[in-house]
Amino acid sequence: MGTISKTDLKQQIKDGIIVSCQALPGEPLYREEGGIMPLLVKAAQEAGAVGIRANSVRDIKEIKEVTTLPIIGIIKRDYPPQEPFITATMREVDELAALDIEVIALDCTKRERYDGLDIVDFIKQIKEKYPEQLFMADISTFEEGLTAYEAGIDFIGTTLSGYTSYSRQEEGPDIELVDRLCRAGIDVIAEGKIHYPDQVKIIHDLGVAGIVVGGAITRPKEIAERFISALHK
């Protein structure tokens, strides 16, 4: 498990960008044999990224070979019919904890979980099992963020705003949610639908602990689609 202190990590990631480097099966940059994500990480590091968010044991192992930047790790694994799929059970937490990464991120929404646990009970379990590990809650509403933070989660990520049926549906980042969480004294890592540099500046000035940008940097198909669609508006 990661051994960095929360204070030290906050110092490392403040005033910078954490770049999410992920590709899922069916996406252009996904290869069964791997090897692509470390290249994206190298590019992000050369650009000045202060951290990396990555998915899967394989990708994280490969990424750790090319960078010493702090890593926020997740495992995306479906558990139908339940909706949560980002580090959704103790199985994924165990797999990530074995990788010695700085932060483990997990779904902390109020949606029904595959393991049947209340999210507060699950947080209690992972904190007891891995007391030195830093955790990030991926949430979609203020109430979810507050619940996770009060339960002991270190960082609250706005990752899932717009991706749950009951959260705010917007084209861009949920800046209002970020602002409200920051005003509540919560350590926020803003993430989700951050497409443009000017949005990053606005979010930074709200007082966040960190900012994650993914698709706008590391998903070339998504980037190309944004340019192409602009021609037809």
UniProtKB/Swiss-Prot annotation:
Reaction equation(s) it catalyzes: an N-acyl-D-glucosamine 6-phosphate = an N-acyl-D-mannosamine 6-phosphate
Entry EC no(s): 5.1.3.9
Pathway: Amino-sugar metabolism; N-acetylneuraminate degradation; D-fructose 6-phosphate from N-acetylneuraminate: step 3/5
A GO molecular-function descriptor: N-acylglucosamine-6-phosphate 2-epimerase activity
Gene Ontology CC terms: cytosol
Keywords: Carbohydrate metabolism, Isomerase
Pfam families reported for this sequence: NanE
A single BP term in Gene Ontology: carbohydrate metabolic process
Record's function text: Converts N-acetylmannosamine-6-phosphate (ManNAc-6-P) to N-acetylglucosamine-6-phosphate (GlcNAc-6-P).
Family: Belongs to the NanE family.
Classification via HAMAP family: ManNAc6P_epimer (MF_01235)
Name of the protein this chain belongs to: Putative N-acetylmannosamine-6-phosphate 2-epimerase
Gene it is expressed from: nanE
